[in-house]
């Protein structure tokens, strides 16, 4: 059980770190220009970097962009406050998950039953991680439905007739965080199941004295 919890926390840590640094939180597989769908034009972006490929009529043109730079220049599709909050809650969740990972590692070599270094700690750090990652997901969804679905293009690209309205979907980097949240429920569920089994009253066998006879 302890080894499984350790592996699970390593998995959660890997999922969240991968989701944090990869550039596929959102993806637009095709864009419109003056009402015409351009399958060779696309956009994908993460929390830090992204890529735009636009067909201006002379072939596709690649452009890598920094989310931070576009936010500071006030031309990006992310709100600065919401962007900071998303990163903050993911970082906070990683902190709680790291503590949970260390506690799980400790439990593979030591038995701590009634402190936060034992199973109760697994509940605590898992719940704190879930709350932090869920807050990040909620804030990002707020940004997604309020602005990202409407536009992920720059002002000059909009002026040129490009449009990404209702063509942007959540991509795999986002779902890695969702998968990490789901994974955190597994050790908690197993602990609940294990505790329920341990708390069941055990039937005691009463020895029978065969020398005593009832008449």
Q: What spans do the regions from the language model cover?
A:
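Interhelical loop segments of eukaryotic multi-pass membrane proteins
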Residues: 27-41, 147-160, 201-204
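Juxtamembrane loop segments immediately following a transmembrane helix
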Residues: 135-171
């Amino acid at each position: 059980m302890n080894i499984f919890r350790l592996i699970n926390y390593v998995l959660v840590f890997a999922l969240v770190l991968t989701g944090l640094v990869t550039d596929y939180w959102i993806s637009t597989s095709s864009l419109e220009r003056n009402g015409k769908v351009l399958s060779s034009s696309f956009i994908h972006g993460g929390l830090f970097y992204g890529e735009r490929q636009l067909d201006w009529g002379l072939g596709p043109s690649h452009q890598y962009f920094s989310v931070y730079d576009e936010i500071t220049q006030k031309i990006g599709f992310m709100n600065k406050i919401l962007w900071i909050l998303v990163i903050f809650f993911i970082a906070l969740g990683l902190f709680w998950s790291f503590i949970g990972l260390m506690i799980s590692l400790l439990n593979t070599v030591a038995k701590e039953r009634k402190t936060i270094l034992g199973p109760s700690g697994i509940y605590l750090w898992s719940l704190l991680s879930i709350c932090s990652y869920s807050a990040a997901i909620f804030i990002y969804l707020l940004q997604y439905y309020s602005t990202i679905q409407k536009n992920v293009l720059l002002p000059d690209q909009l002026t040129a007739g490009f449009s990404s309205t209702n063509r942007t979907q959540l991509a795999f980097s986002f779902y890695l965080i969702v998968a990490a949240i789901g994974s955190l429920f597994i050790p908690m569920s197993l602990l609940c199941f294990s505790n329920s089994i341990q708390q069941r009253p055990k039937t005691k066998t009463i020895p029978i004295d065969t020398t005593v006879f009832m008449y």
